[in-house]
Amino acid sequence: MRVFNTLTDKLEEFKPINDKKVGIYACGVTVYDLCHIGHARSAVVFDVIVKYLRYKGYEVKFVKNFTDIDDKIINRANKEGVSWKEIAEKYTGEYYKDMDRLGITRADIEPKATEHINEMIEIIQTLINKGYAYEIEEGQAKSVYFSVEKFPQYGKLSKKKIDELISGARVEVDERKKSPLDFALWKASKPGEPWWDSPWGKGRPGWHIECSAMSIKYLGETFDIHGGGADLIFPHHENEIAQSEAFTGKPFAKYWIHNGFVTINKEKMSKSLGNVLNIRDLLDIYDAEALRLFLLSSHYRSPIEFAHEYIKEAEATVDRVYSTIMRIEDFEKIEINDKSSIEFDKVKAMLENLKPEFEKAMDDDFNTAKALGILFEFIKEINRFMDKKPSQNKEIDFLVTAKRAIKEIGSVLNLFQRQPVDWYRDLLKVKKIAIKEEEINRLIKERTEARKNKDWKKADSIREQLLSKGIILEDKPDRTIWKVKIN
């Protein structure tokens, strides 16, 4: 199994520090606003990485934090005239609502920065004692800064050089800093800001120290995987490495994994461009499974271009999978006829290779795009096989095994786990179709009667009536089923 390590800038054989045990830390959100599709991508990527490692038999300890104190939280609280705690709690709750709908399994440990102030103070004090950090007087309290030039390996993750960073730095306002690159470990409190007592007086932690303190506490001084979005490589992850390795004298994380951006019209999402897409707004018009599939349809390191037509394509693909499962379930109910026989060596070989091929793709740096392609090719072939009307015992048994394989592979990606009927029920709601399921069933019953009485005009009229509302009818030998039309 190979993973791309941002630290070494190459694909490497994945060898955990402790054989089958894997420690993973992913940087979570700053809880000051609703999550956007970029947060969704990072959450889905690391959710699948954890699921796949567990599928492979690794014992994973997954830690994902909340930054619940930050300038953005304070600014939002001041703007709304409420406490910073209220803002943090409100948006932590909103985060869970979105993530639950996206099918994100909660991390084993989800620490909050404000619950780890003592651990941060201990690291900062050690860094001062070792000469890696220094204090700056701020009235009655002090701020503490990390001295970047004391850590010669600074820039090893982002491949940036200290001298180039210094010469490219903007005009530094604070002359008291030894270098424009030095970053805050502890900030002396300003009037009206939250604060904690510390050896440097009242203040609060800098952003970077929070993740170092929490990851070291729960995963140890050196652990396997540290991850997050590519936007965190510099300065956040670079600063984490510097302060953590200066503190422990040991390597921090063995593998650094970063997911690519979500772009809109080839531009990175940003509030200044006004192109930020909230998860909540998207889940108002699309099923969460379609959004999840869209995010997994590209390799996690590549940028992914958002467009509504791509989500619609993903929705149509999810629909095809559930329709296939529904078809298989219809064949499970048919009367066995062992006289007819269909040649199905090709599709049988595809089933035998399905899991090995899926694993081969996922073992190659979690290539979900390739893995999904393999699954969809198999589903296409299964439908061709069903077009031939299989009816022998061995053929139906094969279809049952195929369905089980689709579900098992889907479970690693948390896709295709619903009953097909629930997929359509949920689409009724998300598409805001102005007809209730009871009414659909009543009209189907009415149409069945009309067909029995050979009243084809009425039967066609009911079909058209439902179609105009976005409901498609499919007549089966023993019944009529309904589906939601995918645009």
Curated annotation (Swiss-Prot):
Gene3D superfamilies in the cross-refs: Cysteine-tRNA ligase, C-terminal anti-codon recognition domain, HUPs
Annotated protein name in UniProt: Cysteine--tRNA ligase
Location of the motif 'KMSKS' region: 268-272
Native source organism of the sequence: Thermodesulfovibrio yellowstonii (strain ATCC 51303 / DSM 11347 / YP87)
Quaternary structure and partners: Monomer.
Entry EC number(s): 6.1.1.16
Record localization: Cytoplasm
Annotated residues for binding of Zn(2+): 27, 211, 236, 240
Ligand binding (ATP): 271
Main location: cytoplasm
Keywords noted in UniProt: Aminoacyl-tRNA synthetase, ATP-binding, Cytoplasm, Ligase, Metal-binding, Nucleotide-binding, Protein biosynthesis, Zinc
Cellular component, GO annotation: cytoplasm; cytosol
Catalytic reactions on record: tRNA(Cys) + L-cysteine + ATP = L-cysteinyl-tRNA(Cys) + AMP + diphosphate
InterPro entries per UniProt: Cys-tRNA-ligase (IPR015803), Cys-tRNA-synt_Ia_DALR (IPR015273), Cys-tRNA/MSH_ligase (IPR024909), CysS_C (IPR056411), Rossmann-like_a/b/a_fold (IPR014729), tRNA-synt_1_cat_dom (IPR032678), tRNAsynth_Ia_anticodon-bd (IPR009080)
